[in-house]
Amino acid sequence: CACLVGSEMCIRDRYKIAGEQLPCVIDVSARCVATHALNIFGDHSDVYACRQTGFAMLCESSVQEVMDLTPVAHCAAIKGKVPFLNFFDGFRTSHEIQKIEMWDYEDLKDMVDMDAINAFRRHALNPEHPCQRGSAQNPDIFFQARESCNPYYDALPEVVEEYMNKVNAKIGTDYKLFNYYGAEDAEKVIIAMGSVCETIDETIDYLLKAGEKVGVIKVRLYRPFSAKHLLAVMPKTVKQISVLDRTKEPGSIGEPLYLDVVAALKDTEFADVPVFTGRYGLGSKDTTPAQIIAVYNNTEKKRFTIGINDDVTNLSLPTGPSPVTAPEGITSCKFWGLGADGTVGANTVSYTHLRAHETCADL
């Protein structure tokens, strides 16, 4: 497991791990990288910095998804011979106390490809069956050898999909490389990954009741990015796409996920659909349903931000009043702490006691 410091410091090692086809999995709680100021809270700055290392990247949106999809990363790494960076939002997901359905090791036993494990063991450095590894190569052969990894990455989306289907069969879920949620005839679609997808889901439920034609595509397998699987879930009726990135790459014409989506849509039936790009949630800035509604309503700003009032470059979208999107019967509480005053600990203990009381079983 790793967070910001560990994730950033081992980038150079990841090139070697991926290059030597070592099937490791690093679980990362995605956090902000310090720039003009230190911020230890959640965004995707650190994981995006690793996107060209050769690690596959799998993203979860909730605590339950972390439980369900982490085995997919491990099994796919073994069979696909590609290491995985398995990430979820720092603090918002990593520190959330939530009821989940737990897996047992026995549940996972029949999912593991023992033939792939044995093949990996046979590739261990051993004088009985020597092999060459980690050599220094000159310009005459390095390029060719580097390209030889292509078949593994081309095959990996199907490997991940195979294990997602095994999880689905076991627990009745519907995990895919890209999951769509919303109206079947949606005209406005957001593409995002991470915990913001839960906020978007809740907002969509609210908007569907009002007759809006909206939806969201949740990215689960970010690397390798499978254009085929993205296009398979894109509504044929879409007229506008907004891509939300939880990072800022100064000087770029767009953030990483946006650039991937634009490239995936090129030369397809969706090539003429306008694609907007927006930033949100840097340093754990809250993202609310009102801001998601502003994204759906935006038709003018091709590049935008939400959650702040940008009075310098005027990229922020105007936000309307906050709607009540929570289901009826839900009571929400927010507790403010001053830092090291025991607020977090007290709430954790209180929650544990309430959950143990039979009249509070639905917490």
Question: Which functions belong to the PLM regions below?
Answer:
Residues 1-6, 11, 353-356, 360-363:
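Single conserved hydrophobic/aromatic residue that forms the stacking wall/gate
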Residues 8, 12-58, 86-87, 107-109:
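N-terminal alpha/beta PP-like core and its mobile active-site loop of ThDP/TPP-dependent enzymes
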Residues 12-14, 35-41, 68-71, 95-102, ...:
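Short acidic, glycine/serine/threonine-rich loops at helix termini
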Residues 38-90, 267-283:
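Conserved thiamine diphosphate
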Residues 84-179:
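Conformationally flexible catalytic loops at phosphate/diphosphate-handling active centers
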Residues 165-188, 317-332:
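Glycine-/acidic-rich phosphate or pyrophosphate-binding loops and their flanking alpha/beta elements
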Residues 191-217, 333-361:
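Anionic-ligand anchoring segments at beta-strand to alpha-helix junctions in alpha/beta enzyme folds, i.e.
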Residues 240-326:
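Peripheral docking tails and interdomain loops at the edges
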